[in-house]
Design a protein with these regions (language model features):
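Solvent-exposed loop/turn segments at secondary-structure junctions
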Residues: 57, 71-75, 108-112, 144-148, ...
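Hydrolases whose catalytic domains are alpha/beta-hydrolase-1, hotdog thioesterase
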Residues: 149-153
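A domain-start/cap signature at the N-terminus of enzymes
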Residues: 21-65, 141-143, 183-186, 220-224, ...
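Gly/Ser-rich "nucleophile elbow"/oxyanion-hole loop immediately N-terminal to the catalytic nucleophile
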Residues: 56-61, 111-145, 155-158
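Bacterial N-terminal signal peptides
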Residues: 11-22
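Structural recognition of the beta-strand scaffold that forms the well-ordered cores
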Residues: 50, 65-69, 101-106, 137-141, ...
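Active-site machinery of serine-nucleophile hydrolases
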Residues: 65, 69-123
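The feature captures the conserved acid-bearing segment of alpha/beta-hydrolase catalytic domains
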Residues: 163, 168-255
Length: 269
């Protein structure tokens, strides 16, 4: 017996359509986390970047998203070096239980993050869309040059990120002016300007007390400015024995960082 379309109850038809739609939109199950390479074109140039995609059991259907900005030594166009220092080694040690999508853009040689904002945001949006990330649980972190880049990107898109984790970063650098955060050079108190713009975003800074590359005073001044501005959640951890490498103790030896970070959600707009 052939069933005519008009004989199917409306509710049943809607249920069938919903099932088909859900099947089309389903996310493949991932037994383990993995790094995948992607490329994106920005201003006519193709850039390779990496994305860590978590195991389905760890990340769920809509995982949080982290953008990681590397330091000077990982610049290039190989599309991989940026996963070898900082957050990448920690993730490799926790492939099956790290719960977040992590986006690893790579700045070209001899450039700063301030000149690569389009690359950062384009790779973030592409990865979030492809892997079904949660835009309200999107976090930004970076080390050294990437710590400067963390402030740069946050200022360019206030409210875009649910939390910031700058590691051994700052706003300006006397020996490398090009690395400084753009748009605040003429301010009488750049720390106060940044704090006023970002006080609504939870921020946890990390630095080494013995850092002779980027002074820990930069993070101390930023922390003081945030608290003076009435910041929603401003934290600073200074590791007493760490030099410039404060990223290993931050990412790999501070488990409470991850508990804190993944609890943050972008404020309802």
């Amino acid at each position: 017996m052939r069933l005519r379309l008009h004989q199917i109850p409306l509710v049943a038809m809607l249920a069938m359509v919903a099932c088909l739609f859900t099947a089309c939109m389903s996310i493949p199950e991932r037994a383990s986390g993995s790094f995948v390479e992607r490329s994106i074109e920005v201003a006519g140039t193709s850039h390779r970047y990496q994305v860590f995609v978590p195991a389905s059991a760890a990340g769920g259907r809509t995982p949080p998203v982290i953008v990681f900005l590397h330091g000077s030594g990982e610049r290039g166009n190989d599309g991989a070096k940026q996963t070898q220092v900082g957050i990448g080694p920690y993730i490799r040690a926790h492939l099956n239980d790290f719960p977040a999508i992590v986006v690893f853009p790579q700045a070209p040689d001899e450039t700063e993050w301030s000149g690569n904002a389009d690359l950062v945001f384009a790779s973030l949006e592409a990865a979030t869309r492809e892997f079904h990330g949660d835009p309200d649980r999107t976090y930004l972190t970076g080390l050294s040059m990437g710590g400067y880049g963390t402030w740069e990107m946050a200022l360019r898109a206030p409210g875009r990120f649910a939390a910031l984790v700058p590691v051994c970063g700052g706003l300006a650098h006397p020996r490398r002016p090009s690395m400084g955060v753009s748009g605040i050079a003429g301010a009488a108190d750049p720390y106060a300007v940044v704090a006023a713009r970002l006080k609504g975003t939870p921020i946890w800074q990390f630095h080494g007390a013995k850092d002779d590359v980027v002074s820990p005073d930069y993070s101390r001044q930023m922390d003081a400015a945030l608290k003076a501005a009435g910041a929603r959640d401003a934290r600073l951890t200074v590791f007493p024995e760490a030099n410039h490498n404060s990223w290993d103790p931050a990412y790999s030896q501070t488990p409470e960082l991850w508990t804190w970070l993944f609890a943050q959600r972008r404020a309802t707009r």
